[in-house]
Amino acid sequence: MLLNDQKFLPINIHYLNQGRFDLNKLKNFNLLINQRENWRFFLINGLKLAFKEFEHFKIKNNNFIIDIVFQEKFLFFKQIRQAYLKKVETFGYNIFIPIIITQKILNKKNNLNLTFFKWLDLGILPSLSPKTSFYIDGISRAVSTQKKKSPGLMFDFDLTKKSSLEKREGEAFLKIIAPRGSWFKISYSEDHIIFIEIRNIAYKIPIFTFLCALGFSLESIFQFFNYNINNFKLIPNKYDNTNALIKARNDIFILYSDLLPLLNKTKKNFEIKYIINHYFFSYIWNSNTRYCGEATRLHLYNKVGSPLSLNSLFLEEIDFIYITKIFIYRLINNNFKDENNDNLKNMRFRNGGDYIYLQTRQGLFDFESFLNINLHNIENNSFFCNITTNKKKEDIYSIKKKKNIKNFNLSKISFLKHILLKSWKSFFLSGTLSQFAENLNPLSYITHARRFTSLGPGSLKKAEASIEVRSINPSYNGRVCPIETPEGFNAGLVHSFSLYSFKGVNGELLLPFYFIYKNIKQSYYLPPIFFNIEEESNQSIITGDLIHEKWNDFLNKKLSLRNNFHLDKNDISKISFQSLSPYHMISLATSLIPFLEHNDANRALMGSNMQRQTVPVLGAHNFIVRTGLDTKFFSDISSIPISQINGFNFESNNNYCYFYKIDNLITLNNISYNYIKKTNHNSLYINESIKKKNPWHQQGDFLINNSVIENGKLALGPNLLLAYLPWHGYNYEDAVIINERCVSQKILTSLHIITLTNSLELAYREINKKKEFFYEVPVKLEILFSFFAPFYYNLKYYKNQEFSQFEKKNPSYYTNNINIGTFLKKGDCIFSKCRIRFSFSRELRLQYKELFILLREAFPTFEDFKNFANIFAYDKYKQKLDRKKQKKNTRLKTDNFIFNKNSTLFKKHKLKALINYYNIEDSTIYAQKNQEGLIISKHLKKVPMTYTSITPFDLEEFLSTKESKKKEYYNLFFTKSINIEILQLRDIQLGDKCAGRHGNKGIISKICPINEMPLLPDGTPIDIILNPLGIPSRMNVGQIFESLLGLAGFYLNETYTINIFDEQFGLEASRSFVLSKLYKASILSNKPWLFLKKNAGKTNIIDGLTGKYFQQPITIGYSSILKLIHMVTDKLHGRSIGGYSTLTLQPTKGKSLLGGQRVGEMELWALQGYGASWALQELYTLKSDLVEARQHFQNYINSFNIESNIYDRNDISLTELESLIISDTFKPYTLECFLEDLKALCIYIDY
C-alpha cells in the first residue's frame, strides 16, 4: 500500500509544539515535501475524518427505519496491479470500507429487524504518484496550491463604498470567517447604523435587531458599553425602548412577508412569534452557520476577549456582544488601518489532499440527500419485501424473500461509489485548480507543482483583484518568491514558493533559521528551527550571505538585521537567528539564473518563466556557468532512475540497467525506465543509459542521459558562441541571427509527437424541422467518389456479393499508406471514409418505399448499403483507368437495369429518390502541412457508442423499437477509431523564438551561411549574433558576466558554480572574478586576444563578408541558448476570410479565431520598402479596415465599378512624405521614383 511505501516519502518530518518542526538534515530536504506530506496526511487521517462526520445515516419512514454505519477505522486500500493500470490508465487505489446496515420494518403487531455486514467498494481514488503528479486517463495532471483567507476575524475597508465618517477612505467592516459554512459581516452604513450580513441571506439586519433576536434585552445590551456611542445608532428611529424586542422580531417577520397568507388571523400574534423563532433558529442561527473552528475561536479570544473556552467550536450569543463592542471601539479610534489583511499570517494554503477531503465530504452529503429523496417516499412495504400473514399463527409475520431487502438496500448503497467517483472526477477533470502538468522539462514540472494561486473557488476573482492584492507584502520574505510570477492578467495572483518554505499542519508557511548563541552560529550541533510569521516577527534575524570565521564567529560587530519585517543596523549581541542561505528568498527557477543580482527584477521574472518554456533539443549540454541547484530536483521528482546500491553495472539496454551487488553473496538487481518519454506539450526526449569507462556505480548516481540531463546535471540548451553586434539591420529590435551550423548539425533540433485521432462520425441534427442521421463508412481507396457520377448501381445486385472478391482482382488499388515506418507528407490519405446521410422526412421515406414496391425489390438494409459504398468507390476508380478503352456508347449492364444518358423517365425518378434519401459525401482525412512526419505507432480499436449519439443501423428495426428498449438496442453496436502518432524533427527556422537565462529573448530573423558569419581571430565562426542595444535599456547585465565567464571556461575546460549576492566577498567581486578567469584563459590557451588590457571583455573580430577586422572590439562569449515552445510551425497561418471585432472593426487576433494583421502604418513601410505597389494599393484602399472600403471590395467581386479613395489614416504617411522634400527645386531621383509608385496607389502629391 501507499502508506507503507518508503519510496513515496524519503523524508520524515517531526512535528513539535507551537506548530514548528525541524529536519534532521536540511541539506537532504525534498522540494515536493509539501504535496507529499499533505497527501499522506489525507490518506491516513483525512479520509477517515470525512467518513467519521457522516458515520451514521438514519432514514426513517412510517413503514421502516434504515441505519447505515461506516466502520472508518477499518478503511482498506488495495493497490492497482500493473496490468490493470494499463487498462484504466489511472494511477490510484481501490478503496473499501466496511458498513453495517440495520433495517427495521414497522408493523402493527411486530417489528422485523434485519442486520448484515458488507465491504463496500468506493471505486478508484486517483492518488499521488511517486513523481508527485496525478495520472488520470493516461494524462499527467498537477494540482495547484491555493491561498485563501485564514479563518478568524478580519478588519478592513471597502474602498468601493463611501464612508460615513470623516477622514475615512472607505466603508469599515468586520468579517467573521469560518473554515466552512457561513460568514458574518458587520459594517457601518452611511446612516450611522451598524448592520450585520450573513453569507446565505441576501439582506442586511440591524445589529440591535440581531442581538434582540438572540434573546438579549435592551438593558443587557447597553450595560456592556462603558464609553460614548452617541454617534452610532444601535437602535433605528422606528424602534422605542418599550417594545424594541417585539418590533425587532416583527422586522424579521416582515422580511419574510411571503408567509403572511399562510397564517391564521385569530392566532396571528402567536404564530408570528413561532414562525420567526423557528425560521431564525433554523436558517440563520443553526449549527452550520455557527461553526467557527479552532482558528476563529483563538482570534475571538485574542482580538475580542471572548470569555468562552478555546474548546468551544461554535459561535455563542455572548460572542456577538464582544464583537460589536470591539467594532465600535475601533470605529471611534480609527484603528482599522493597523490590520494588514494581505499578510501571510492571515492566509492559509490548501493542497490536493485538502481538496479531495472537501470533495469526499460533498459526495457523502449528496449521498445522504440521495437516500432521503429515494427512500423517504416509499409507502408500500411490498416494494422491499413480501410480507404475509401465517394462517396458523396470525400474530407472526414471515418474510418470503429476505434477499429482496438486502439486494434493494445494496443497490441504493452502491450509488455511493458513483457519487464519490463523480465528485472526485469533477475536481480532477473540470476543476480550475487541477491542470495538465507542465512536464515540458523537469524544471517546468517541479515549478508547476510548487506554485500557488490566489484564484479559484471561494477565493479571489481575476477581474476583481486590486493592486494591493497583487503587490508584494513584506511577509513574503523567505516564503514567497517576489520575482517569479506570470506576465499579464495573472501577475501577482500566481506565485511560487521560495526555496526553503514549508507548509505546516494548519496550512501556514514555515521558514528555517540557524540559532545564534554568543556570536556563534549553531549550525553543526543544532538543526534549524522553523518559525511561522508571528514567531519570526518577534526575533532579530540577519541574512544568510554574511561572512563568518572558521568557528562560525561573525567578523563584523554591527550588522543589518530584520526585526518585525523592518531593517535596522544593530549590535551583533542582539541577533538571535540567521537565514540558512542567500537563496532563501527566491524560488527554484529564479535560483538557476547566475549573477541574478546584476539583473533587473522584471527581466529576472522573464528569465524564470522562459526556462520553464524550454523545449528539449538534441544538442543540449551542461551549463558552463551554473548555480549548483540544478541537480537537486532530479532526485526529488523521481523521474530519473538512480542507483539504489553500490554495484557493478555489467549490462544496459533501452529499458533496463543490470547491477551486481558485491557482498557476501553476489546478487543481481535491475532498474527499469522508459526509453521514450512524451510530455503533455507533445515534445519528446529519449533516455539513454550513461556509458562510463568505469562501470562501478555508487549509491545515488544517475543512470541515464537525455535531452535535459547530462551526467546528472540540468542541460536545457547548447552553449553557443555569441557576439553582441549590430549586423546589417537583421538583429534590429531584439531579432536574432544564427549560424547555419545550428541547423545542419541538429544543435537546436527538437523532437515532437503529433497524435491524430480519427473516428467514424455518429451525429444527429435537425435541418428545417427534418431529422437527419449521419454515419461514416470506412473505405479502402485513396481516391473516393462523388455521388453524382455517370453510373449508378442497383443495390439488390450487390446484396450477396463479398467485397473481398473485388480486392483480389486489383490488389494494387488497395495499398495502405498508414504503415509504421513510413513518412507522411502533405496530401497523403490518413483515413478514407465516406459519409452516409439518412433523412427522416416522411415524404422522402414514403416515396422511397413506393419506389421499391413498384420495382419489386426488398427494402435495403444498412449493411447492404455499406457494401454498396465500398463497391461503388472501387468501381469509380476502375472507371477512371478504363475510360480510354471504353467507347462512348458502351453501356454497363447489371441485373435488371441499364444506366446511360438515354435512360427512361421512370429510371430517372428512381435515381432522384436515391439521391434524396441516401446522400453520400466524401469525408476523407488528408494530411496537412504541419502533420508531416514519421509514423511510429498506429492503433485501431472499437469504441462503444453512447446513448446520445447513436445512429440506427436498420431504420425499420429502429422505428419499430420501443423507447424503453432502445438503450439495449444501442449497446449492440460499436464504432471504429484509429490513433496515429507521428514523430517530427523540427529544426530551428525563421520565426522561432529563442532566449537566454536573463530574460533576453528574440525571434530568429536570419540563418546565415558559415562563410558570412563574423569570425574570431583564430577563424572560429560566431554561432549567434545578438543586438547590443538590448542590454542597457533592459538592465540585465548578468548575461554579459555569464558569456565572458563561459568564454573563459570553454578555453580552460572548466565549469563554474556561482553564488548570488557575491558582494560579501568584496567590492565588484563578480567583475574581478570574471576578468581574472579571462586573463588566465588568454595565458594558458596562448590566445592573447581573449583579454585586451585597454578593452577588457572585448575582442577584435573579423567580418565574414569582407575579411577585414571591425573598427571597434566586440563583446563575445559562450552562453546557454534556450529554444522555447513558441515555434512558428504551430503559430503560422493564413487568413483569407475571417471575422472582425465589433468594437474596433479590426481583424480578430489569433490562430483559433482566424485572425489577421491590420494593414497600418508599419505595414505600409514594409510594403513600400519591398516595392509591392499593387499589393499596397489593394490592401491600403479596398481592403482597409473601414466598412466603406469592404463594400467597395464587394462591388469589385460583383463586377461593379469601384473607386479608390484615400482615408484619414493616410495623413500620417503624407505628412512624412512632405518632410522629405528639402526644397521645391531639388528632388532626389529616388524620391521621384517613389512618387511615381504612389500614383499607382491613387495618391497624388504636387510640389
From Swiss-Prot:
Matching InterPro entries: DNA-dir_RNA_pol_su2, DNA-dir_RNAP_su2_dom, DNA-dir_RNAP_su2_hyb_sf, RNA_pol_Rpb2_2_sf, RNA_pol_Rpb2_3, RNA_pol_Rpb2_7, RNA_pol_RPB2_OB-fold
Keyword Repeat: no
UniProt KW keywords: DNA-directed RNA polymerase, Nucleotidyltransferase, Plastid, Transcription, Transferase
Highest taxon of source: Eukaryota
Membrane-crossing residue ranges in chain numbering: none
Bridged cysteine pairs (disulfide): none
Compartments, record wording: Plastid
Family to which the UniProt record says this protein belongs: Belongs to the RNA polymerase beta chain family.
Record-linked PANTHER family: DNA-DIRECTED RNA POLYMERASE I SUBUNIT 2
Quaternary structure note: In plastids the minimal PEP RNA polymerase catalytic core is composed of four subunits: alpha, beta, beta', and beta''. When a (nuclear-encoded) sigma factor is associated with the core the holoenzyme is formed, which can initiate transcription.
Protein's name in the database: DNA-directed RNA polymerase subunit beta
Provenance organism: Helicosporidium sp. subsp. Simulium jonesii (Green alga)
Biological classification of the source: Eukaryota, Viridiplantae, Chlorophyta, core chlorophytes, Trebouxiophyceae
